[in-house]
């Protein structure tokens, strides 16, 4: 149910967009106002697994209040004039899932953006490139002995969790503006509680799931956001090729990849 919002300017057409909770559509339960096709969010959660992934974002914030929950510090304030909550979740899926649930329960965020770095799963995706999630899944979930597909969580119909299309389209547009020299890919991101640095493991993930990038948090964030009917997007800059060269590549390109991801995230907030 919704009530139309009147606009004093004929050129600015506002409307309430009602989101339902059907699990196959991944629509928001919250009401957002939409103007000229752009979502206007009241509060946006930004998650990075490591301090390096959120430090530069926090430096740009104003009017900051810090709230501690579950050994995580949530920085609540404004960024580019928008209300945000920025947090370092810690590495791994349990940390990431807990962090997302706290953002939903305590701060009532209306969208979640996960920024960070990842390994490439696609030969066309090179170090420094950006991958925007179409969907996310757990590559290390294995309950095939109970009749489920590999990657599928038992007692859940969903095999993967779809990211928000509007957020993804905005990110793709923004990336071309702020990082025109960087290639942007839209595709599946696979998550597991392991750093992939073995080509045989990488090849097995590709064979089973496809995908464009592999990392350690996105699927947990996507699952928690999905179950709370909150739109999400995972933004990953590629730091390594997820093979035998991964450790060497990661050390060399980590900070440059983080810079790309942070730059894109901040500009997205500006336009939301």
What are these regions (language model features)?
Residues 1-17:
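Single conserved hydrophobic/aromatic residue that forms the stacking wall/gate
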